[in-house]
Amino acid sequence: MRGGHVRILLAFGLAAFVAAGALLLAPSKSSGRHVTAALGAPDTVLGGTSSFSSASAPGQTVGYSRAYRVPPLRTLKPAPFKYIPQSEAFEDAAPIAQPGSKVPDGAVQRSARKNLMPGPIANFDGISNLCGCSPPDTNGDVGPNHYMEWVNLHYAIYTKTGTVVVPPTPGNTLFPGTPHCASLNRGDPIVLYDQYAGKWMASQFAFTGGGTTGPFYQCIAISNTSDPTSGWCAYDFTVHATKLNDYPKFGIWPTQNSYTMTAPLFPTNGSAGSQGVFGFERDRMITCQSARFVFQDMLSLDPSLPRILPADADGPNLPPANAPQPIVTDNDDGAGFPQDRIDVWNATMTWGTTPTISVVRQGYIPTAPFDTNLGSTCPSPQRQCIPQPGTTNKIDALPNRPMYRLAYRNYGAHEALAFAHTVDADAPSGNRAGMRWYELRKTTGSWGIQNQGTFGPADGLYRWMGAAAMDGSGDLAVGYSIGNGTAPNYPGIAYAGRLVGDPPDTLAQGEAMMHPGGGSQTGSPRWGDYSMMTTDPVDDCTFWYTTEYIQTTGSVPWRTRIASFKFPSCGAPPPPPPPPPPPPPPPPPPPPPPPPPPPPPPPPPPPTAKCRVPRVIGLRLAAAKTRIRRANCSTGRIRRSRSTRVGRVIGQSPKAGVVRARGFKVNLVVGRR
């Protein structure tokens, strides 16, 4: 949410649900539209620093920003910043399930096994409340050697062991020289590591005054290398003239060359709000060139659409070539929808002379029943439902939206999506928050639910504000806030998970505590508004999670925590086959006088193992050597070549699949700066 500078109360108008627009796992034939406005040659900066213009299709615009070089962050002097010690007002009245509509949860897990979840590896404090604001909007991501966190109005960079290399710094420091972003520090930040480009993406929104008059901006910066303390390239996009781009969420989608953003849009004239889908021109941004964006206002496609999330790609495998980018939301029947479900849309962007965007409804997936209403006694708008010890102040569960990220993976044989949101684990008789999580899967055709569950062990604890992700082996983890109204259960941090082979629809590895709380928040109900679970690009196994907690009772004394953990089975080689059964006993010798038959000749020796050349392109050199050795081959000549994929194999000879004698040498080409 907005970073403590303003108090904004904007009504989110809801139109009636259009049943004819909802398709059950069937493609839409009428909901996609295309931009047709040309922007000129890609290398052209059109008429200034940034711009936007209407396109011919309803609710669409196109725009651009020039690129601004940023010196290394470790050398930058922090930008001027005025602290404003106030909490924020609620930003919308998004659909909340109504009292009386509650039904039992159809996928609740009442028990949790103990001592199976791995403990934290790294576990250190991140940024605390330097801005005097609430909530912190905690998020961050991990790269090859660093963790970068951006909490509301400040970012910081750490080594993976928690050493601070760039101290907490006002967010607008990242945008020197830009016309608006250099002086406006509004928050709602997102940090992502783009492992396909070997660069970081960091963003926050910006506006002048109190956010009630336009235009409105999105500030985006891309690092020059995989080292976030080095130089960056900044962009200052004017994204709308009259609608505030609140609560933006990003997803990297390389096969569409897009940094894709979704955001609730709040008109300054008080008319109905809507959702927006923005695509920013990734291939030009990672090379620090002027870049364009395309935008679809979803008001023209579905005026009742609630908050949506764009898929964010993880892992070494790219999405399939030209695959559209999934966008999802969860819908509670208690908020006026026909049934509890997940809606799936597909976004496609093109970046020729005439850029285009198409957002098409794929359909919806019925889910096990859930309720996002946590009780009619919760203060309006029925989200402030989490009790704390020693205070009557309840904190915000944000049960009415899918929580960041929508984590995507391409496992080759199938694709997967994972996300979580807060529901009532004790419905209909109770009002205790639990974590609903999903693993969606697609082999061909449409997405479907592979696993789903509500993690709500019968221990009286509330679990809320979660985030989910999957590792390279298909294991899933969910991090979240945990606590209740009885000491010592102050707002803390926990996580749970499942292995790929665990029983379906359960977090069968149980729960582990990341960091206990030590106090309550008494001055504001705001919490979150999001947290972040990511996976380490180095091993594709280690999860990293960050969110807030309370250490000592006070008004808004939040702190943040950054921790990692890893399932031991992830990335391990398959177990060896069982030994063959013992041979049967020899038959008794024949009676004399005939002599026993001669013993059978020994079996021929097994054939010498062959070298079957594996595919190692895209792997780091050490991993490539390991894979070559396991294939009964050996590493030959290693040549270095300039590439954006530093340290990764970009060429091999011979190609994969060739069979040679054992120990045959495979020559490699490795990327360098």
Sequence positions of predicted segments:
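Residues at the start of alpha-helices and the adjacent loop-to-helix junctions
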Residues: 5-8, 132, 646
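Ligand-recognition elements built from short beta-strands and adjacent flexible loops
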Residues: 574-673
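Sec-dependent, cleavable N-terminal signal peptides
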Residues: 1-35
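C-terminal PAP-associated
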Residues: 29-573
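A short acidic, often aromatic-flanked loop/helix-cap motif at beta-alpha or helix-coil junctions
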Residues: 18, 242, 644
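Short, functionally important structural connectors and interaction interfaces within domains
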Residues: 17, 387-390, 395, 608, ...
